């Protein structure tokens, strides 16, 4: 179905909303050893994309923004909440390196950190279950790209392990947005797992 086709967006929806709600947003892209920059204010481009220099040792995208005080007043970010969100994104985009830097010191969240999880969801599950007895030494993990297999847009990834304890947990995401109350994608996934186990 189309229920989750556009909700949450990978970066298009998020970036446009952040842009509209920021008094200043600067995007820098280091690509092919060159550094490009574009500046925005309240959703409006302040100029064209410009090459601003060389970037022989850099790569990736850097986004800096200031929330618009006319909209948000003097509200402050909660670094711990953002830190957890960014960490989960690093698990969801296996292999991507995300560098965290915060000028807000709250006493519990690091001001600098680097997240890189080549194993993606398996790394998340192993870290979460650290020290917990499991039936399998390694998570049952994989992914299916629906476009390659069925010629429809979409992809599913998973990592599962079983423990002797009844205290299990499920964490699901749709378009990198947490879905704490599950949803049709989670129900369908568990139905497929149960059917596969019964068939086995």
Regions found by a protein language model. Name each.
Residues 80, 88, 95-200:
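GHKL/Histidine-kinase-like ATPase module
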Residues 1-130:
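GHKL-type ATPase core
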């Amino acid at each position: 179905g189309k229920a989750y086709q556009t909700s949450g967006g990978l970066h298009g929806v998020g970036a446009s909303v952040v842009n509209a709600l920021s008094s200043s947003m600067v995007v820098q892209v280091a690509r092919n050893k060159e550094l490009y920059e574009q500046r925005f204010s309240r959703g409006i481009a302040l100029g064209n994309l410009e090459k601003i220099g060389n970037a022989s040792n850099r790569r990736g995208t850097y986004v800096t923004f200031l929330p618009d005080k006319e909209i948000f007043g003097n509200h402050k970010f909660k670094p711990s909440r953002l830190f957890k969100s960014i960490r989960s994104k690093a698990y969801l985009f296996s292999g991507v390196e995300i560098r965290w830097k915060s000028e807000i010191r709250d006493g519990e969240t690091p001001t600098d950190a680097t997240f890189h999880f080549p194993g993606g969801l398996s790394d998340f599950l192993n870290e979460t279950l650290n020290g917990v007895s499991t039936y399998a030494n390694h998570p049952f993990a994989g992914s299916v790209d629906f476009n390659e297999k069925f010629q429809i847009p979409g992809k599913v990834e998973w990592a599962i392990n079983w423990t002797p304890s009844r205290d299990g947990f499920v964490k699901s995401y749709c378009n990198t947005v947490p879905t704490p109350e599950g949803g049709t994608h989670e129900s369908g996934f568990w139905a497929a797992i149960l059917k596969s186990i019964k068939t086995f």
